[in-house]
């Protein structure tokens, strides 16, 4: 029975270790931004569901509201640049949508800083959505840097995955505080996270079977990439989440503008750094695939899908011409 099983996710923040060396201030603020986003999602949903208006909402409106929340997160642990999350397997379909939308929300805040051409030093780009007052009482914007996670998801019985108190030593005494995760399914999730490059989500074959059944018309977002490894095309939910327009074309156009464009800029900037650019190239493939899946699931004709491909290709071409021509000129 699925209600006896727990989904466990392990997510790692890409580039964080290197960022702590080159720009520790931004690394710290990005980590804080992740925590703040999770906290605000949790608190916002409590406020919504405790409001007088909520009880009068239709079931469809309530369902839509919860898609953007984190109501399925039974456990969520933030440790340094990683996240550990647990959810009941009966909520599998809603959990992957909520997780995907969380990743979209976190990524979008920073990606909007890269919609224009990136200067010679990426650290010269300020994060326009964040500011603080320094010791001289000047308002400052920290450097912008993408917040992208790669993750692994697995599943096991509740007895196999244990969220238990952390044992800490304080003043030479043991005190249980916070949570830790142990269990073979968690170890499997950690191993799955390392399967590929870029901000991707990989899951076990056991979890994939449950998702393919529960996702119904959206089951195509789960694809097999190895014998026992599947990938969740979470960028499909990015198209849904970034615009929320009733017209699918408007959502696709918005994803091309606000997701594809900044990642193209980042790929162009890191083009000569093979170890870094591979992550953005994989992200570009993932965005492309997510947009086409969205079009297909929304019953686009073959002619309409070809038009979407043309729009993405034109965006790709214009961006790369802009980058390479400017490189030639310099």
Where are these regions (language model features)?
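Short, glycine/acidic-rich hinge or "gate" loops at secondary-structure transitions
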Residues: 48-60, 116-131, 210-211
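A broadly used, surface-exposed interaction patch
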Residues: 85, 89-138, 165, 169-172
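A short glycine-enriched loop-to-beta-strand structural element that forms part of the catalytic core
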Residues: 73-82, 118-137, 142-163
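Short, glycine/acidic-rich beta->alpha junctions
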Residues: 145, 183-184
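Catalytic NTP-binding/metal-coordinating core of nucleotidyl cyclase/transferase enzymes
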Residues: 1-114
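Catalytic/regulatory signature loops of cyclic-dinucleotide turnover enzymes
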Residues: 155, 184-207
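Intrinsically disordered, glycine/charged-rich C-terminal tails and inter-domain linkers
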Residues: 198-330
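Flexible, glycine/charge-rich interdomain/linker segments that couple
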Residues: 163-180, 198-214
């Amino acid at each position: 029975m699925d209600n006896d099983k727990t989904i466990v996710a392990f997510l790692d923040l890409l580039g964080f270790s290197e960022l702590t060396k080159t720009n520790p201030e931004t690394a710290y603020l990005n980590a804080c931004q992740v925590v703040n986003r999770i906290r605000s999602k949790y608190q916002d949903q409590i406020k919504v569901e405790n409001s007088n208006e909520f009880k009068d909402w239709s079931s469809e409106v309530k369902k839509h509201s919860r898609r953007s929340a984190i109501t399925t997160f039974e456990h969520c642990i933030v440790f340094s640049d990683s996240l550990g999350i647990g959810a009941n397997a009966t909520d599998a379909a809603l959990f992957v949508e909520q997780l995907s939308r969380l990743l979209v929300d976190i990524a979008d805040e920073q990606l909007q800083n890269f919609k224009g051409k990136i200067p010679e030093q990426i650290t010269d780009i300020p994060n326009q959505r964040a500011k603080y007052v320094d010791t001289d009482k000047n308002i400052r914007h920290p450097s912008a840097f993408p917040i992208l996670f790669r993750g692994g998801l697995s599943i096991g019985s509740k007895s196999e995955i244990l969220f238990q108190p952390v044992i800490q030593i304080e003043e030479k005494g043991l005190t249980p505080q916070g949570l830790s995760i142990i269990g073979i399914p968690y170890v499997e999730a950690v191993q799955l996270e390392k399967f590929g490059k870029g901000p991707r989500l990989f899951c076990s074959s056991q979890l994939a079977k449950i998702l393919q059944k529960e996702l119904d018309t959206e089951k195509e977002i789960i694809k097999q990439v190895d014998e026992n490894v599947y990938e969740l095309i979470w960028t499909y939910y990015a198209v849904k989440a970034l615009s929320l327009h009733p017209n699918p074309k408007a959502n696709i156009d918005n994803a091309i503008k606000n997701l594809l464009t900044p990642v193209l800029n980042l790929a162009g900037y890191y083009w000569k750094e093979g170890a870094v650019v591979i992550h953005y190239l994989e992200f570009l493939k993932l965005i492309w695939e997510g947009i086409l899946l969205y079009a297909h699931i929304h019953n686009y004709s073959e002619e309409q899908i070809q038009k979407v491909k043309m729009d993405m290709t034109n965006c790709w071409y214009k961006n790369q011409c802009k980058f390479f021509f400017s490189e030639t000129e310099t």
